[in-house]
């Protein structure tokens, strides 16, 4: 029997050493490539890029198609057609979030409000509260988790892929300053229609066991992104952003480092593999 598309992509992505459903998004006229990372400011970033690109089209008198849904690709924010050569003059960025608040936000948005059986990792499991949700995903292979629940270092393939900048949701002002430096045409348009105010609900859902489960499931996220593993520190940003694999301390100037000519992906084998994988998808080969 012929394997389904999801299964086939999983097999091929494993062989290539990439994540099967990571999402590279780009704008035709702006120097940004964004690696999607759900529940970590993705709606705000995508909406901002769409707004800026739409304004560019209108200034040039070019007709374009734009979806009001920020998560849907359109002429303003594309998920196909990016060529490796076009990345040499674009900045690769993403944004991360404290694992405690991100894990709870994913549960409140995607599980508590719908039938958990929608997600393969939760199928055949009793999921009546946040702790049971964590127990279910703890039993699942991390790379096969839905990317709302998956560890962020897998979504970003970090530190294998070299990013020009990785920002923190807890410090969105750094994103705003970066966008202003990259192009005066990009303004950070805060948008969070799927927000579940997870930060204010931590004590309502976190048991001692749930805390330990998040510390175990997302141990590498805490480590590589610099987050403290204490629940009381869930709203604290580790710094301004990550540039060149280094966490830039809060208050330290980072724009000069982050806004240099984007060359960090130039000799990055992990990024090359990701681009080849997306090329196969573009060509409808998988």
Describe the residue ranges of each PLM region.
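Membrane-interface amphipathic segments in extracytoplasmic regions
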Residues: 1-284
């Amino acid at each position: 029997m012929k394997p389904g598309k999801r299964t086939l992509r999983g097999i091929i992505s494993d062989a290539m050493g990439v994540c099967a459903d990571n999402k590279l998004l780009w704008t035709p006229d702006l120097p940004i490539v964004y690696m999607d990372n759900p529940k970590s400011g993705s709606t705000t970033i995508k909406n901002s890029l769409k707004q800026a690109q739409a304004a560019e089209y209108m200034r040039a008198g070019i007709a374009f198609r734009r979806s009001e849904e920020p998560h849907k690709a359109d002429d303003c924010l594309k998920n196909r057609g990016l060529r490796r050569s076009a990345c040499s003059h674009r900045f690769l960025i993403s944004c991360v979030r404290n694992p405690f608040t991100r894990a709870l936000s994913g549960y409140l948005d995607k599980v508590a409000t719908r039938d958990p059986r929608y997600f393969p990792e939760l199928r055949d499991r009793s999921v009546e509260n946040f702790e049971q949700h964590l127990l279910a995903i703890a039993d699942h292979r991390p790379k096969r988790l839905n990317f709302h629940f998956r560890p962020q270092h897998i979504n970003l393939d970090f530190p294998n892929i070299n990013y020009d900048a990785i920002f923190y949701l807890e410090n969105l002002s750094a994103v705003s300053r970066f966008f202003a430096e990259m192009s005066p045409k990009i303004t950070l348009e805060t948008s969070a229609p799927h927000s579940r105010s997870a930060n204010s609900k931590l004590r309502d859902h976190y048991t001692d066991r749930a805390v330990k489960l998040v510390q175990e499931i997302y141990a590498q996220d805490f480590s590589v992104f610099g987050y403290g593993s204490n629940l009381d520190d869930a709203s604290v940003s580790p710094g301004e952003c990550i540039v060149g694999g280094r966490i830039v301390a809060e208050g330290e100037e980072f724009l000069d480092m982050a806004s240099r000519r984007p060359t960090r992906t130039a000799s990055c084998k992990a990024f090359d593999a990701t681009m080849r994988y997306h090329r196969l998808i573009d060509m409808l080969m998988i």
